[in-house]
């Protein structure tokens, strides 16, 4: 038998079931409904649903068939008009067979008066999210090894030992079957400290343009949450928030493929399941935001790397340590490492939880799809995500709301991450200020050579014999003139970018400053002595003619300098 695609909707008085059976014979079908049971048969399709509310046969039921689309539409009257049926989009839970009220768990605690069913006695029980403290007891090594469980609700053991080759690329912990919970945490914290890169963090801290762009992205749950808040402002019922989240045909197909299960969880395991859900949602929210909803080949790596539940098989004792661990891993592993992204993912997770089970299920289905399309990561679906997708459909909305309030009550600061971020940022800002002050001092001429005084140029010192008498430099023979030129090139290149050196000659535009030097006028700039020395050196180099050359030739050189047209040899 094939399970057909179906969809349930409702109004105040009727429940509508739309069943798609494209290859069935419309003349041969059967429909049965009574109380919470609904059955439909049209060869080769069979559909059995356990409804969240009671329906009744009173003559007002209706049925139609669209031959073009192959869809049966059946309208069933509610036993209590006006009643709101919750969880109509939880298809896996609807496909589950009706439980026997007299059935008992297969495993019971000896001496206990009875094991309460999640949906019955603990319906109104206040869920305690505080840490449950117990006295310390020394535990033997053999006992520790027997407690090395993992997976959804810590129900798995021995899986990694059999799949060591496949899981080595998926998880960070080695030999989880023989690693106690305490040792897992110690190794995880040490690995995070070793992975933290201060340079990468500071680069994202100061150059945060890409991060700011990511923060502006609005995922689908923002609009749904805004609609929910608006509807609550109009005093509408909280149950209507489920209608704000819709599932695609692909997601509905995923739900129909899941195998319905019942989970026997004690109080501790039950709390661990909720805590693990928060951890997975935080990692998922980060990934959706940085990729702006378009998953990439790195999406599976990002989600599992940011979730210690998935890559370290971590278990939790309170909500705050989940948030701290997530913050540490965001600043250690992915491409964008900014504390604002941690806080944004935290607020996104709160919005998803406030939207209820439908929104959480939609996120889990997306995670399941990402892992299923990644070769090594699909094993995490078997260990965690598939069970979460089935379990969340039966979870109590009241407990999910209590978890949301517990998450809203916690706060996170950089100092709590244990990575010395405040000290690191303060040191970086101090260095940045010092570098800025140094650059400002270099750009301000008043800070350069404050004790230097401009020296007037001595044009009379140049003669046809090529000798020079200056107070700022000693006399040198003609054979040392190239070395003098070389010693003047380096500081001049640093001070004036207009200087050009060609071969062994030296050319400079002296359109303005050359005039002042030739006229004996001092320069206001601290570079005046250097320019004067350069002018004298140039004159010494240019006067390389025999003694018979007239002084007028030298004057022509000075005129060329004033026009900025000094030729180069």
From Swiss-Prot:
Specify where it is mainly localized: cytoplasm
What InterPro entries does the annotation carry?
CS_dom, HSP20-like_chaperone, Shq1, SHQ1-like_CS, Shq1_C
Highest taxon listed in the record's lineage: Eukaryota
| Cellular location(s) | Cytoplasm, Cytosol; Nucleus, Nucleoplasm
State if Transmembrane helix is listed as a keyword: no
Homology family: Belongs to the SHQ1 family.
Q: What is this protein called?
A: Protein SHQ1 homolog
